[in-house]
Amino acid sequence: MQTGDLVMFRGRGPVAAIIRWWTRSAWDHCGVLWMVEGVPCVIEARFSGGVAVHALANRQEDGPTVYPTGRLVDIPGALVHCGDLYSVKDAILAGLGESGDHAGWECAEFAALLLGLDHDARGWTPQGLIEALSAQP
């Protein structure tokens, strides 16, 4: 695992199942790995708390899967967004394949920003991130 890897989550609750159905994805949430002095953390936009950094060990109940991306991440630039709000509206629009108004962040949109993808191009979903990264050389 290294900073910049994509971390995909598959929660167990009914809301997670609805998100997977709505976004046609195997995952309901994603974030970007940040190794902090050897400790794997994830920087992510979550419904509860908005953009924040959490130790990956504290997120094991959501069945994380780590996908190597080989991408460099601007951590100081990412940390500027800590405390930004989560956007339910953007999350709903992402499920429709539309881009939101960026009044806040939804998880895949924020991960796309951190990974250097065009986060304004479309409504990002966890599945869409995997597909976009797989298609790039």
Label each region the model flagged.
Residues 3-5:
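Loop/turn positions that initiate beta-strands
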Residues 9-71, 93-102:
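Glycine-rich catalytic cores of cysteine/serine-nucleophile enzymes that process amide/ester linkages
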Residues 68-90:
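A structural motif
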Residues 91-137:
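Activation targets extended, charge/polar-rich intrinsically disordered C-terminal tails
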